[in-house]
A protein has these predicted regions:
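Conserved hydrophobic residues forming the short capping helix/wall of the S-adenosyl-L-methionine
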Residues: 30-31, 54-58, 112
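Donor nucleotide-sugar binding loop of glycosyltransferases
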Residues: 16-19, 46, 75, 101
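N-proximal low-complexity "stem/linker" segments adjacent to membrane-targeting elements
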Residues: 1-29
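A conserved acidic beta->alpha catalytic loop
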Residues: 43-52, 98
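Conserved donor nucleotide-binding strand/loop of the catalytic core
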Residues: 36-41, 51-85
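Structural signature of the Rossmann-like NAD(P)-dependent dehydrogenase/reductase core
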Residues: 8, 43-46, 68
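Acceptor/aglycone-binding surface of glycosyltransferases and processive sugar-polymer synthases
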Residues: 69-85, 90-93, 99-152
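Acidic helix N-cap motif at the loop->helix transition within catalytic regions
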Residues: 18-22, 48-57
Length: 152
């Protein structure tokens, strides 16, 4: 790993003890040998063993960095703090619950390589999501609320 990675993968987590090891493994499998990268996990004061499992993973995953909030601040703040801590010029974000496939990151990297220099953002669109009904309802509500507030 270079002193300054080319890509930072930011992953906010809260109570994801069963998901951190598989997701770290998937990120490493997708990126190691392709690009110099770091993985920045931001633990938003998990009450389970998420932090301990991340610390254990650091022993075998040199790309892994772990940041912990002192108090619960929410997913958006965790992403923001992860981005601020990132050392690479390019940043990918993944949800800590495994809903995003790290294998898609190389596809975005390939598109970036073909793009004009003025292009600064690459994004994917998830299909066949596995979200619960309550999560879909909450997402829809937040989007509609933001739309109403932006018109005021």
């Amino acid at each position: 790993m270079r002193a300054t990675p080319q890509l930072s993968v930011v992953v906010p987590v809260h109570n994801e003890e069963d998901n951190v090891a598989p997701l770290v493994g998937e990120i490493v499998a997708a990126l190691r040998g392709l690009v110099d990268f770091e993985i920045v996990y931001v633990d938003d004061t998990s009450r389970d063993s998420t932090l301990e499992r991340l610390r254990d993973l650091q022993a075998t995953t040199p790309e892994l960095r772990v940041i912990r909030h002192l108090s619960n601040a929410g997913q958006s703040t965790a992403v923001r703090n992860g981005v601020k801590a990132a050392r690479a010029p390019w940043i990918a974000t993944l949800d800590g619950d495994g809903q995003n496939d790290p294998a898609d990151i190389p596809k975005l990297i390939a598109e970036r390589a073909k793009a004009a220099p003025e292009v600064k953002l690459f994004a994917g669109w998830r299909v066949n999501r596995q979200d619960s009904g309550s999560k879909r309802w909450a997402s829809t509500w937040r989007i509609k609320r933001a739309a109403v507030l932006s018109q005021q």
